[in-house]
Design a protein with these regions (language model features):
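Short, Lys/Arg-rich cytosolic juxtamembrane segment immediately N-terminal
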Residues: 8-12
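Short low-polarity hydrophobic stretches
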Residues: 25-29, 320, 371, 438
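Preferential activation on post-signal-peptide N-terminal prodomains/segments
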Residues: 2-6, 16-312
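Zymogen propeptides/activation segments of proteases
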Residues: 18, 149-153, 157-206, 317, ...
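Short, non-transmembrane alpha-helical segments in secretory-pathway proteins
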Residues: 94-112, 119, 233-255, 304-346, ...
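Exposed beta-strand-loop-beta-strand "reactive/processing" segments of non-cytosolic proteins
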Residues: 247-292, 331-386, 415-438
Length: 438
């Protein structure tokens, strides 16, 4: 009896030891795999799939394509019950208002195919009672915008600047950056508008209408008083551990780590991080330049053959947006980025982003950020980080109604933006010509 008990205890101990050994082996393997660069592993192997599954790599298109919008609207408007209200250049108001009208856009962007139309047809639709308007800075692919809004209508051949929908005539109008108009038939129920009214809080406005030089769908706010602060730049040191910058997070955004080999240039004003797949040049003042070496990369939007067409662009945009959000948080810039243009050149796609402060674009002579993909692989990226602070002074912009009246025949749209002026960044109203965006 005692021998049987001792045998049972020994068996239990042996099983426990075996389990512990197996667990230790698994932990050691996981620890080793965590230190391996994803780019150094062949894509179609069990090891690469395990790395992706455990450490957030390519875990499937459904995970990478989040559906989160990468572009912030410049203006939104909702017309119902005999009045038109709108919001502009305010991140919080934009987020709340866009959520309120999203269901309308889902229906408006799920209609028939787009066909080219004329200005008068749009002008006639602008007087409808139930309307919505959505305007972006730049040139955003139509299919991408439709996907963000939950729509099913696709067209991979055009980019959009402004979308307008009239529920009264069941017409969707799309304005391209070149000024071309497209129209689609789409139905949206009245109940969707009624629900949107409960959460959409804007200021009274009107459409410019026909007869002027600006586009007829241009929003003119009643008694507009757009007052914005003047900005100054603050010193940025990406290498200062005490300055609040997360260098490890900056490196991690590009698939590198604090253990990645680097060398210094210009008396340590620039550090160049190098591994087998890529090079990241990091200037302490905020300029980041990423390039790949050979066919590999530490950043991928999707695996070869995983997605094609519009889904590929969606994944590229989502990858760039996520990376850029991580960089901006790590550098504590208090700004955010908005997709501005998508440029195709053969097998390569370049995504260009604007920098926004408080919802207002900050314009420079060079792009704030750009990402070049070849298929799912990030080949190059440039980010010009800046940190701003209000000077304590402010400036009131010329109201859109007055600015629209002063527009020349080739100045069809307007935007508010910051530009460098006498040592500060000052807000002003700018005119845009057809084709200037993107």
């Amino acid at each position: 009896m005692r021998g049987a008990e001792r045998s049972a205890r020994n068996t239990a101990k042996n099983i426990s030891l075996i389990v512990l050994v197996v667990l230790m082996a698994v932990l050691c393997a996981a620890n080793w795999l965590a230190g391996v660069s994803a780019a150094s592993l062949d894509s179609d192997t069990l090891l690469r799939r395990a790395h992706d599954r455990l450490f957030g790599g390519a875990a499937g298109y459904e995970i990478r394509s989040s559906g989160v919008s990468a572009a912030s609207p410049a203006q939104l408007a909702l017309g119902a019950e005999g009045k038109l209200v709108g919001v502009q250049y305010n991140v919080t108001d934009m987020d709340t208002s866009l959520a309120a009208v999203r269901a309308i856009w889902t229906q408006a962007l799920s209609g028939g195919a787009l066909e080219e139309t004329d200005e008068q047809t749009l002008a006639d639709a602008l007087i409808a009672e139930r309307t919505v308007l959505l305007r972006y800075h730049g040139a955003i692919p139509f299919s991408v915008v439709s996907g963000w809004m939950g729509g099913t209508l696709k067209n991979d051949n055009i980019s959009v600047e402004t979308l307008f929908y009239s529920a009264d005539s069941s017409e969707l109008f799309v304005r391209t950056p070149e000024g071309t108009l497209y129209r689609s038939h789409a139905e949206a129920d009245r109940g969707t508008f009624d629900r949107a009214l409960e959460d959409f809080h804007g200021l009274d406005c009107t459409f410019a209408g026909a007869g002027g030089n600006v586009y007829p769908e241009t929003l003119l706010f009643a008694n507009e008083n757009l007052t914005l602060p003047l900005l100054r730049t603050e010193a940025l040191d990406l290498f200062d551990a005490q300055g609040g910058t997360g260098l490890a997070s900056l490196l991690g955004a590009f698939g590198l780590s604090a253990y990645t080999d680097f060398y210094s240039e210009q008396s340590d004003a620039v550090r160049v991080f190098v591994d087998d797949a890529s090079t990241l040049r990091l200037a302490k003042t905020g300029r980041m330049q990423y390039t790949t070496t050979g066919d590999q990369s530490t950043v991928t939007a999707y695996e070869s053959g995983e997605v094609t067409g519009a889904a590929a662009i969606d994944a590229q945009i989502d990858c760039a947006r996520t990376l850029l959000d991580t960089v901006l948080r790590a550098a504590q810039t208090d700004t955010h980025a908005s997709l501005y243009a998508v440029r195709k050149d053969g097998s390569r796609t370049t995504l260009v982003f604007l920098q926004l402060y408080g919802g207002v674009p900050v314009l420079e002579s060079t792009d704030f950020a750009s990402f070049t993909f070849e298929g799912g692989v990030l080949r190059a990226a440039t980010v010009n980080l800046q940190r701003f602070a209000a000077t304590g002074e402010s400036r009131t912009l010329l109201p859109a109604e007055q600015a629209s009246a002063a527009a020349s025949p080739d100045e069809r749209s307007m935007m508010a933006a910051y530009r460098a002026e006498n040592g500060v960044y000052a807000p002003a109203r700018f005119y845009m010509k057809p084709g200037q965006a993107g």
